[in-house]
Amino acid sequence: THCISSAASDVYKRQQYVNDENTISFPWSMIDKITPRPADTVAESLKEAGVEDMDPVITSKRTYIAPFVNAEGPQYLVIEDRFPNGRPQLEKAGVYMTDRDTVNKVERMKVTTCLNPLHTALAVYGCVLGYDLIADEMKDKELSELVKRIGLVEGMPVVTNPGIIDPEKFADEVINVRIPNPFMPDTPQRIATDTSQKVGIRYGETIKSYVAKDGSARALTAIPLAIAGWCRYLLGIDDNSEAFELSPDPMADESVSYTHLRAHET
């Protein structure tokens, strides 16, 4: 009985400690830096530059590790400034220190308007059109115009502005610097993973904002085209009539069944 009481007392003390905001905190954060798995092309480039032992390794869990990291130059780290015991001057390293509401706004800006919706559009159309690299898709005038319209034309009128980062400049960097980066070997197949879990957030929030603002989302054309592209992708046949493997998705069976049903109806 004494042991049980002692254990219960310890648990209570720990709970009190964790719940005391003057003692400990759990700041919210948002990080944005595209970092795909290590690519053989990057390893080869490093070898040509005289750097040895750069070969990526596939682990027993099918994850990829390497002595190098594929990472882009632009990076954003936004942290809720709630540290009751003090903190380093993270601002000097380029970290945005702000309040919780602003962290959420930055996340919403990125996920619903300025980056993720563009990525998903390129992912589904990239698979259908036979692309292996996201960067190469930006050489296609129609795909490039599609993502510009999604982000800059349709997204900006209802974008969440966090104040600490300018949405238009952020989106412009995404479109003109980050996505076209030829040294960022990201694939449409990777980004197409779990699309059923993403569509509602990446496009639905903008659609809802238009309805709330104008009473209708009929002004949108690029966003519906991106969603239609996902439905086309779910058929699993590219534009050369060749079958391709769909990326992993927890609702793949349901999504594919519905898409095939609707395709037969039309």
Residue ranges and their predicted role:
Residues T1-A8, Y12, H260-H264:
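Single conserved hydrophobic/aromatic residue that forms the stacking wall/gate
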Residues S5, S9-R37, D132-V158:
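Catalytic or ion-translocation cores adjacent to nucleophile or general acid/base/metal-coordination motifs
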Residues N104, A121, Y131:
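Solvent-exposed loop/linker segments at secondary-structure transitions
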